[in-house]
């Protein structure tokens, strides 16, 4: 198994850690940007499937107004 000859300096360890953190931050920013563009549905680079349309419009409005109509 490979074993390092000398102890790695704190400066070198810090540089490597900073590189890893920077790459993680860049990936997180990219993912957030991609998520934001998907939620706005304004970008042209993605395919947005059409929303399913219910044939019976009463299914979507179930429960609304029934209690209010009964009280009157």
UniProtKB/Swiss-Prot annotation:
UniProt KW Nucleotide-binding keyword: no
Mind listing the GO molecular function terms for this protein? structural constituent of ribosome
**Cellular component per GO, a single term:** large ribosomal subunit
**Cell compartments where the protein resides:** Plastid, Chloroplast
Q: Where is this region: Disordered?
A: 49-72
What keywords appear on the UniProt entry? Chloroplast, Plastid, Ribonucleoprotein, Ribosomal protein
Write out the biased-composition intervals (Basic and acidic residues): 59-72
What InterPro entries does the database record attribute to this sequence?
A: Ribosomal_bL32, Ribosomal_bL32_plant/cyanobact
GO biological process annotations for this chain's record?
Answer: translation
Q: Which domain of life is it from?
A: Eukaryota
Checking Pfam families in the record gives: Ribosomal_L32p (PF01783)
Family according to the record: Belongs to the bacterial ribosomal protein bL32 family.
Protein name, per record: Large ribosomal subunit protein bL32c
